[in-house]
Amino acid sequence: MNSLFASTARGLEELLKNELEGLGAESCQIVQGGVHYQVSDRLMYQSLMWSRLASRILLPLTECAVYSDLDLYLGVQAIDWPAMFSSDKTFAVHFSGLNEVIRNSQYGALKVKDAIVDSFTRKNLPRPNVDREQPDIRVNVWLNKDTASIALDLSGEGLHQRGYRQQTGQAPLKENLAAAIVLRSGWQSGTPLVDPMCGSGTLLIEAAMIASDRAPGLQRKHWGFTGWSKFDPSLWSDVTREAHERARQGIAQTSSRFFGYDNDARVIDRARINARNAGLAELIGFTTQDVLKLTNPLAQGPVGTVLSNPPYGERLDSEPALIALHGQLGRIMKTHFGGWNLSLFSASPELLSCLQLRAERQFKAKNGPLDCVQKNYQLAENPTGAPAGQLAEDYANRLRKNVKKLDKWARQEGIQCYRVYDADLPDYNVAVDRYGDWVVIQEYAAPKTIDPAKARQRLFDVISATLSVLDLPANKLVLKTREKQKGKSQYQKLGEKGDFFEVAEYNAKLWVNLTDYLDTGVFLDHRIARKMLGQMSKGKDFLNLFAYTGSASVHAGLGGARTTTTIDMSRTYLEWAERNMRLNGLSGRQHRLMQADCLSWLRDADEQFDLIFIDPPTFSNSKRMDESFDVQRDHLDLMKDLKRLLRKNGTVMFSNNKRGFKMDFAGMEALGLVANEITTKTQSQDFARNRQIHNCWLITHAGKE
């Protein structure tokens, strides 16, 4: 009997054990990452030929303690390598694992290689050559703490390499994992199988191999045992001949039908080539088609299974589209595949929840480094009633109510950018803003006490509900995560798309960009303040400090300001401000834009203005500023500098976002200034719930006429 070890992906050990026992293996013992088992010579070859789930099959040789590199060398050399293979065979060493003395896997492999070569030369035999690409013999060494396990790799290349797949998509599944997904899906051989997002066709091809009794190793050209001294060519020939005969009979007898779809014609071409290479082209029909147009190819035929590995996203900006895709996929399944089974394999259980289906079974597995889940669903024949798991129902109802009221108000006001939801419900801590026919969802960072998986699930529910309530295409939704800003974070670039579009705010037109920056180019809560500035500016010299994209200057210019001066430290935002001014026909020498540290400029300026708008940061310690700034601590110093620039009958509109800001009235009186709070006058309906989003003041000289 041969004692072997079959490795597999984490989570598939039990499935592999059942497969090996079905092949006739004895004494099967599961360990993490594989199964130890015992077989005769014939069953050894059959397990290599027929295992659909094993990654590799190893013949353990010995174990040795490794407290020094010499221990490793001697432990390997103790094996009679010339009895394993002859000098004319090539070999390679795969070494994994580190400890305190073997700190580099390449060094470990080198010591093993030296020990093997020396075992030949010590017997005055020619030294075998190393071939890292396609050796006759592969030696596998795994170092776990202070123990090295040494084995012959009978597989050669990984067993997932069946030989049919020269063409793959962007994110292919390994064939042995695909086979496991098929086996766990609930699909029964003889029934139809549909993959609506098939990519390079691996799931369908593996299923067709099962249905047609085709051995997964039948097309492999190279094995790790053919250079082994104990290789029995006659026995292997019998195993191979039997596999060919079973495949010939199986493809003639199978009644299963397989259907694969993908929206990329090039990917479908690759899938067809792979199926042809596998000898299964006649069983699988591949069609170029968007999943959203999917219907049941056997609407009047037998009940089958829909099986797929749908896309998932690691980038934040891909999530709205994927959430919408999964929601639509769930509706398609319920509409066209009643009575069928559905099985989906994904690295994102949150996305699977968007199907609004209740899973009957689920399995876990690793796909490389990714933790994945496979969920099986039984689709009702005649679906009725509410879907399983109404997503964010409270949020959806509140959003629906808000939109009904605010959309009408916005049309009457002549504005296209406004907030429709502002963390109204504690469980759904997001802000939702409309920008024309676009929507931005800003997720406020969850407290550390909230389970990240739970927070992510709620966000997915919010996105799905928003798309549904607003009847919004996913490509019109932008997702942002907002955390407490520090320093220059408001200037942080998020992307390079450069997607600007025009929106209306009263009589002004403004450019917004929803994707490239944390902020969009217009602060919605200051909308009424900008309108007031426009009404106050006729015939006046207007100064806009910390101007951002200059939207206040646009309103002042349209209101008839004699001059506008727009100052910000960011060149990017000043260029944006210039575009906004030009968009509204405001150009010429009377409309100045200056890049400067606003606080330094204030201290040095000797100009006079009638109307000044200043909206400084709550706190800033930018490297480009000479010193830190705290609006609560430093607002009197700020007012002292502003007073010097303010004409006798002039007005400063001072706003900030500091919660709990307290105006130093005594200090203002000492400066000869009067402050009148106008916060309630600058708050609009869409920010009615958040009275502390900003505070706003009109500052004048004491005794102003």
Curated annotation (Swiss-Prot):
- Keywords, ordered alphabetically: Cytoplasm, Methyltransferase, RNA-binding, rRNA processing, S-adenosyl-L-methionine, Transferase
Q: Which SMART domains match?
A: THUMP
Q: Disulfide pairs?
A: none
Gene Ontology CC entries for this record: cytoplasm
The reply on keyword Cell inner membrane is no
Physiological role: Specifically methylates the guanine in position 2445 (m2G2445) and the guanine in position 2069 (m7G2069) of 23S rRNA.
Q: What is this protein called?
A: Ribosomal RNA large subunit methyltransferase K/L
Q: Which organism is it from?
A: Erwinia tasmaniensis (strain DSM 17950 / CFBP 7177 / CIP 109463 / NCPPB 4357 / Et1/99)
Tell me the gene name: rlmL
